[in-house]
């Protein structure tokens, strides 16, 4: 399953957005209002839970300086990655798009597609409001 958020313009430099996303505790500011739990587990890992959903642990998997931050599920039960692509547009601005990639069976994919799309759209909108 491959889902993409709309591309948003951020009134911050590419470096500022990259630095923000490299700190896992900052993801709490990006979470939807339906967030029930958020906990920083260490410098590269955090746990969150949205209303009606199970707890999910995300961790930094890799990054490309200034342009990409990749988070992934810490559990192999639901293998997925969430990539933030950050593109410099000049004038101290950048654009950001989130890309979700997961390996799920067809039934699971049908059940989670809409909630995940809504989730990454909200994260993206909130990045745009930084």
PLM segments and residue spans:
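Beta-strand/loop substructures that line and gate deep hydrophobic ligand-binding cavities in soluble
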Residues: 74-125
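Amphipathic alpha-helical hairpins
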Residues: 2, 8, 30, 69, ...
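A short, structured loop/turn motif at beta-sheet edges
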Residues: 14, 61-66, 86-95
């Amino acid at each position: 399953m491959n889902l993409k958020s709309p591309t948003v313009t951020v009134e911050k430099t590419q470096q500022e957005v990259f630095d923000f996303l490299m700190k896992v505790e900052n993801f709490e500011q990006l979470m939807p209002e339906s967030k029930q739990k958020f906990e920083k587990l260490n410098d590269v890992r955090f746990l969150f839970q949205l209303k009606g959903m199970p707890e999910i642990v995300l961790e930094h998997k890799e990054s490309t300086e200034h342009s990409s931050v990749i988070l992934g599920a810490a559990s192999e039960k639901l293998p997925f990655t969430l990539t933030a692509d950050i593109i410099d547009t000049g004038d101290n601005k950048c654009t950001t798009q989130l890309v979700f990639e997961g390996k799920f069976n067809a039934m699971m994919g049908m059940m989670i597609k809409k909630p995940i799309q809504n989730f990454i759209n909200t994260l993206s909108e909130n990045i745009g409001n930084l």
